[in-house]
Amino acid sequence: VYPYDKLASKVLGFTGGDNQGILGLEVFYDKYLKGKTGRIRTLTDGKGVEIDGAYEEREEPVSGNDLYTSLDVNLQNYAVQACRKVKKEKKAKQVSMILMNPQNGEIYAMVNEPEYNLNKPFSLSAQKRAKNSKKQQEYLNKKWRNSCLNDTYEPGSVFKIITATAGLELSKVQVNDHFNCPGFRIVEDRKIRCHKVGGHGSETFKEGVMNSCNPVFMDVGARVGVDGMYQTFRQLGLFEKTGIDLPGEASSIMHQKKNVGAVELATMSFGPVSYTHLRAHET
């Protein structure tokens, strides 16, 4: 029995009828949690009746281990409420949130709203139950999916901090360097726009970061170059999984270095790569 029903369901996972872990922490730590069933071996006659005085061999049951996580019930509940509010306001199909200690990577909350009831993991609506078994399984897999680490997304402007890191660490830009944003940059035959129509005009790098200005980051990316960007990606672990103790973590998706030209470098500088919600937090 799971006392909190839906809370952190896509992190905890659940067990099957044989008490074997199926998803989440339950399957990842299954060999430590499941314990060992006890048994008694003895002699019986042809009718299966135990023979008096026969030798017995006993194997005592062994309890499974306890598992302590970094999840905080209060923070998890708070994050759930925040996700539900956003989901309702934005009419979103799902909302995810991670609360993490930036010093050591401990996860205090991981929410994938809507969650499911751990005590009824196979329940489906009447409409979905009417589908064939293959379709039902697809619904269940989607319902159980931990989108914080099983799915990748384009992070958008969140990625600009990585370009900024590359520029500053490799001394290709200083905070007071000046740039000009007319609202776009022409890269080869492509016109790549800023999010602000008409542009930000003259601005320092610091102001470009504050304004989340695409042309500024395209310029910084060009200064850093392909080698410098990929060096920074490697140092920040973008080519690797985080190694979280949960199953099914997806890998980052980005251009092969040999295929990155001027246009790809420009767009890469402000976001069009793909990685998990968790990878974004870890980085």
Question: Model segments located where?
Answer:
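Small/polar-residue-rich segments within soluble enzyme cores
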Residues: V1-G64, T267
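Generic short beta-strand
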Residues: V95-I98, Y108
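Conserved, well-ordered alpha-helix/loop/beta-strand core segments that scaffold catalytic motifs
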Residues: A54-V95
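Beta-lactam-recognizing serine transpeptidase/beta-lactamase-like catalytic domain environment
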Residues: D45-E56, L71, P102-V158, I162-R279
